[in-house]
């Protein structure tokens, strides 16, 4: 078991631990803690040695396996898996400095470019554009306002003139062409001179020989020559030559005869123009465009005037009305007053008829509305209390004892103590006097009218109607907020227990009133 790394036999321990390290028990007595520490030290040393041996064995196995693979590859034999006799441990990883790998130089694709190359190309293009852009002298020609330059750029050249140094501004230095650019500018000037074309020059003799000089030498307007040449001829529209207006205004010479009627240019020569009849009948009017309706406004002779037609705008004719003319401010005549009176009466009669119709319509509407409304009449209802007088009325809530259920609420209303009218005297203000009650004058039937009656609110349904007898007992129970009155009531010949809940003041007042009536009934 030499190959077993975990073998902890005594022979191995004796080899690893020297003889002098373990003292004898006879010389030194060890305590329990020292013994445990010593044994732990032995175990750690044994395990460290086993680890070193296993690492050496695994390295030797790897070397032998690599040598066998090389031999087999040289001989051309197929590799066979060899079963491992022992399990090797994984060797420890040795960390070493990484090798610097040199990247291979590869040709990048023109489509795939790095971000730095794109930025570099963009900067180069911007520099080219800035170099090509001419420096503008005027501030208005620049795209952006001129920024302040640092002081070191404001240095200017000094020029000696007359023994003194003058500072030349930087703008003049920039605008001044360099020595290399001067020959180019001179060449461009020579080329521009050669390309110039001689322009024709004018002279006074050439203008005098032209046809326009005649108009310039004459004192009259150039268009006056045409008027002078046409003197003595008839006008284009057939008017006499003496008329200056081509539209046939009245001639200054009244003795000039009007022109004859124009002839048609086609057809027979003797046929006159159909438009000549309008112009030929107008005496003294030579306008070709004279309207036949103008005579009605101007009073001149025209074709319509000869036919007897008159215009509505004839001057001198007064306006015609139904009434006779009278001077301004004159009093009105009696006839006019009578006419106006008749008209006023007619208007009044019409207005009166309209008012009567309106009144009739209103009455009809009112009658219809009255028919629609319900006519409510006061109806007398006999509640059976007409011959009785109420001595006391208090508000209470009634409870009735039901078999198998207990107290059951029947309703709430006014609890009244009624007696016949003939048994009570009435004081001033129709208020009965309870002390004046005398049951001696009552018969047996009237005595039954001394009773307790109660009606439910809103519906007025009778929920209690019992006579008061001398033998009845009324028991009052006072509580914190209210009081109850317990008694026996008679309904349909049956006796039922009734409980009335009311305020303490009302309970006291009710019990006092009932006790007085019981006493008087018992005495009678």
Curated annotation (Swiss-Prot):
Give me the stretches of Low complexity compositional bias.
Answer: 248-277
Spell out the Polar residues composition-biased ranges: 200-219
Which Gene Ontology cellular component terms are annotated?
nuclear membrane; nuclear pore
Answer whether the UniProt record assigns the keyword Coiled coil to this protein.
yes
Instruction: Show the Pfam families listed in the entry.
Output: Ran_BP1 (PF00638)
- Family annotation (InterPro entries): PH-like_dom_sf, Ran_bind_dom, RanBP1-like
Q: Tell me which domain of life the UniProt entry assigns to the organism this sequence originates from.
A: Eukaryota
Q: How does it sit in the membrane?
A: Peripheral membrane protein
> Which PANTHER family does its entry note?
RAN BINDING PROTEIN, RAN-BINDING PROTEIN 3B-RELATED
Per the record, the domain comment is: Contains FG repeats. FG repeats are interaction sites for karyopherins (importins, exportins) and form probably an affinity gradient, guiding the transport proteins unidirectionally with their cargo through the NPC. FG repeat regions are highly flexible and lack ordered secondary structure. The overall conservation of FG repeats regarding exact sequence, spacing, and repeat unit length is limited. FG repeat types and their physico-chemical environment change across the NPC from the nucleoplasmic to the cytoplasmic side.
Q: What is this protein called?
A: Nucleoporin NUP56
